């Protein structure tokens, strides 16, 4: 099987968020970066499928030069090779622009399966995976908690897979799909492995193919404003006799706090 995993570099959760002067994104020039956590689970699932069915795992990431940090990390964890879609404008690309850039790099590989994380930790729109499937012209399924692959017994692409989707209210859904396909992986689907010293050293010798991105396309989605929520705290003193105070408290909880 040839499995492609799309990964994204995001700021670390410990980094102190600062909004830029235009209030359209964060001021990330001095940020610390890490692999998007849902993508780490997608990578782990791909590595497990490779161990079971054979083949190779290719990681693809779109963004400026700094994304090679997470590409190297993915290679150290066990991916075989990588593709870097290089473009400074991709750092703040919307889902459509990002998916188009990824699709252009993935199509020539003709993969059996493409995995992405369910969503990114920084924006959380959960759109890139489904738009990517449309750009590649293959079926997709989202919020995946289990993957069972039945590869083709012949040469070339084919086969099918059975996936478990997480629904609302504790419900799950099993779906059977033909390959090739795109899946968006839910966090917690597996237990993550971490890079060993041998893996880190071996990653230095693995191929990272640099693919220049197409000229920047017009964004179809634009963030108009971003802000840090302010904390609002109000204290109200209820006076009167105990009976009067209790009656007033119940009224406040019902009408203002809507807690009862």
Identify the residue ranges that each predicted region occupies:
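N-terminal glycine-rich FAD/FM-binding segment characteristic of electron-transfer flavoproteins
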Residues: 1-260
């Amino acid at each position: 099987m040839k499995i492609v995993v799309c990964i994204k570099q995001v700021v670390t959760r410990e980094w102190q968020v600062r909004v830029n002067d235009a209030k359209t994104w964060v001021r990330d020039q001095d940020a610390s970066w890490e692999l998007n956590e849902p993508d780490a689970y997608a990578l782990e699932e791909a590595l497990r499928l490779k161990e079971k069915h054979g083949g190779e795992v290719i990681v693809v990431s779109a963004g400026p030069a700094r994304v090679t940090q997470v590409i190297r990390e993915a290679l150290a964890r066990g991916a075989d090779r990588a593709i870097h879609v290089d473009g400074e404008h991709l750092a703040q690309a919307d889902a459509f622009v990002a998916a188009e850039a990824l699709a252009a790099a993935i199509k020539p590989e003709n993969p059996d399966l493409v995995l992405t994380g369910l969503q990114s930790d920084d924006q959380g729109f959960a759109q890139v995976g489904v738009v990517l499937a449309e750009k590649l012209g293959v079926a997709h399924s989202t919020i995946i908690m289990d993957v069972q692959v039945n590869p083709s017994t012949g040469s070339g692409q084919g086969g099918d897979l059975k996936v478990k989707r997480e629904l609302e209210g504790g419900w799950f859904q099993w779906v059977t799909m033909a390959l090739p396909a795109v899946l968006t992986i839910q966090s917690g689907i597996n237990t993550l492995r971490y890079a060993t010293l041998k893996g880190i050293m071996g990653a230095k010798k693995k191929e990272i193919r640099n693919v220049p991105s197409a000229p920047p396309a017009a964004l179809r989605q634009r963030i108009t404003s971003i802000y840090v929520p302010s904390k609002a705290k109000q204290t109200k003193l209820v006076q009167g006799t105990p009976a009067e105070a209790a009656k007033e408290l119940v009224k406040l909880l019902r009408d203002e706090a809507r807690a009862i």
